[in-house]
């Protein structure tokens, strides 16, 4: 129609990086890269980091934290078959620095200081995963995704999760049927319970 102007196509970037710096020594960084290897296959990666050096006023325990993650992917795109494989790792280190009101107020100042110095508020978490997805044309299995994730922490906690989710699509007479099936397993263990009174690790599935 007359007078209608076509919008300018938005330029999309395959790679980008961001960096932010704030008070308390805060650093926020992110890097994403994607590279076409051939007309059909590609690789990609994502790096993320968020941290603070701490220093909050009147906090008597260490209050810094770190959160770093790396994700990698490789994929192939075809007319009848497309798939990708993903690998990732995340490390988080936190200091749980909160204390009850009046903590150690009944002690002599030197004894209270020694008590606080003996507290280790640090906890670390680790996640590593491997997963992928496949899409198939003209097949009863339309697509399927799967992922394995392992979690651990500084206190010997451990957790494994594995799931598979295929999608089936087929026809019966003139009826089209599409359904998902999910297989999801979760299991792990804790070295100590809340009261630190157990002898053997606590396991669950």
Please give the residue ranges for each predicted region:
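Outer-membrane beta-barrel translocator/receptor signature
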Residues: 8-58, 62-68
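Residue-level signature of outer-membrane beta-barrel architecture
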Residues: 35, 76-78, 134-138, 168-175
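Internal metal/ion-chelating core segments
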Residues: 163-205
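Transmembrane beta-barrel strands of outer-membrane/channel proteins
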Residues: 19-21, 47-49, 85-91, 144-150, ...
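N-terminal periplasmic/intermembrane-space "pro-region" immediately following the signal or transit peptide
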Residues: 1-7
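Gram-negative (and chloroplast) outer-membrane scaffold detector with strong preference
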Residues: 75-82, 127
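Outer-envelope beta-barrel architecture signal
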Residues: 11-15, 39-43, 79-85, 140-144, ...
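Flexible loop and strand-edge segments within Gram-negative outer membrane beta-barrel domains
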Residues: 52-71, 86-165, 197-201
């Amino acid at each position: 129609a007359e007078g209608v102007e076509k919008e300018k196509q938005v330029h999309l970037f395959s790679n980008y990086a961001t960096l932010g710096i704030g008070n308390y020594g805060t650093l926020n960084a992110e890097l994403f890269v994607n590279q076409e290897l051939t007309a059909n296959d590609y690789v990609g990666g994502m790096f993320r980091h968020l941290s603070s050096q701490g220093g909050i006023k009147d906090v008597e325990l260490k209050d810094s934290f770190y959160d770093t993650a790396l994700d990698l992917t490789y994929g192939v795109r075809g007319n009848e078959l497309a798939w990708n494989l993903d690998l990732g790792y995340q490390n988080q280190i936190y200091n749980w620095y909160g204390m009850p009101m009046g903590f150690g107020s009944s002690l002599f100042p030197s004894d209270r200081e020694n008590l606080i110095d003996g507290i280790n508020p640090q906890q670390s978490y680790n996640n590593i995963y491997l997963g992928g997805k496949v899409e198939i044309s003209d097949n009863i299995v339309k697509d399927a995704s799967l992922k394995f994730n392992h979690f651990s922490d500084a206190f010997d906690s451990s957790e494994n999760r594995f799931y598979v989710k295929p999608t089936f699509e087929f026809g019966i007479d003139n009826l089209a049927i599409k359904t998902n099936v999910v297989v999801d397993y979760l299991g792990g263990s804790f070295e100590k319970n809340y009261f630190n009174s157990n002898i053997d690790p606590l396991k669950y599935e």
